[in-house]
Amino acid sequence: MMAENQDRGRRSKWLVVGILVAALSGVAYWFLVANASPDDRPEGTLADIASLRDRDDLNVLFVVIDTLRSDRLSAYGYERGTSPTLDYLSQTGVRFDQHRAQSSWTKSSMASLWTGLYPIRTDVLRHTDAVPEVAVLPAEIFQEAGFVTGGIWRNGWVAPNFGFSQGFDIYQTPAGQQAPASMRSEAKAGRIDGTDIDLVFTATEFLRSNMDERWFLYLHFMDVHQYITTEETAVFGSTYSDIYDNSILWTDSQFGEIIMELYRLGLASKTLIVVVSDHGEAFGEHGAEGHARDLFSEVTLTPFILSFPFRMAQSGVVRSQTENVDVWPTVLDMLGLPGLEEPDGQSRVELLLGRQPTPRLDLGFAQLDRNWGQLEKEESALLAVRKGSLRFIHDVEDPERDLLYDIDMDPAEQRNIKDERAAEVQELLEEAERHLALDPLWRGGSESVEIDEMQMRQLRALGYSIE
């Protein structure tokens, strides 16, 4: 085992070096550096995407990279080469260009991602809330279809007692591995044990153990949230924002280890890869740093990338607005599996295949209770409503602080046009009020769970104030 770990360490070092070369040179085809095998997936077309539902050999790798805003990825046009692995998957797959999460803190966002329901309908809004057992989650659908289901996570907000382990044969935090001596965490608040090296090691063991089975594997990377980087990947500078970019490059290299393992095991040509995030990160664009405080675009614009068991001859870009609630309706539809229970999200497969026009007037919502970590305080709700090019942020406590942006003209949301567009504000306010009046899908709403002192310390170690 020691020799195997040393061999893995050498491979990891060379992969980091190779991806670093790719990042600095602007080369997305990182297979050509890092002593990697050529991409032996066959070439595919839209017709092959439509035919995925007919395959009986397909695996699904579902990757959540925590705290990852899409505009910091070179795959999404960022000027720095932060994400050569994701670049390659995007260039040979499909990228959803205007994609948003449903909240700016993990548990509420992940509840919406897994169920396809908006936060108002999951009722997972506060730190003691949990997804109820009656909910139907994707892992249960895969399990029923005969897949081996595995989940490997490092964020305490997706722990089993919050309802996220439903349907998983294996649902675990990874065992600790030795980290490089040059590794460091620059997180301003909070520090959790381990690194994504641990996750990669455990994921590799899962892939090797189940390479002859059909599997569904969920990986939740955390090193971007923790601002972890190494000497080799600390190439973009030393400000807090620079360190965030460095940590994306580091995490991208670790994700690259998983991709390389798929090739080594002969699984790349029969694996669908889905990459998303739970929320982004702020760097003072609207006065705040971090996340879980507001709903501006820097904390809600997130990636959604699909990589297929074949290389698309031409990369696909879906420019319509999509959301995390659409992810699982899309993936399950693509695979021909049963859908979620009454989701708010919708399958985007037809849109992906070019069979329907761009739905410019689709409504989208994100929600945050600013007092989510303080049970003794009343709810302090923010609701973002997106309709066409307009994005309305409604402060339920104080509507005088409502904001309106034209995200086509002002994607950074720097110019509040509320006073200039009274009719649109009224229309969007009515949409917000209708949305907030919705009932949870499940009778009684979310469950409330007790959090013991050890788990509370672990959650506070993420950097949050919880009372």
Which residues does each predicted region cover?
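Catalytic domains that recognize anionic headgroups
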Residues: M2-E467
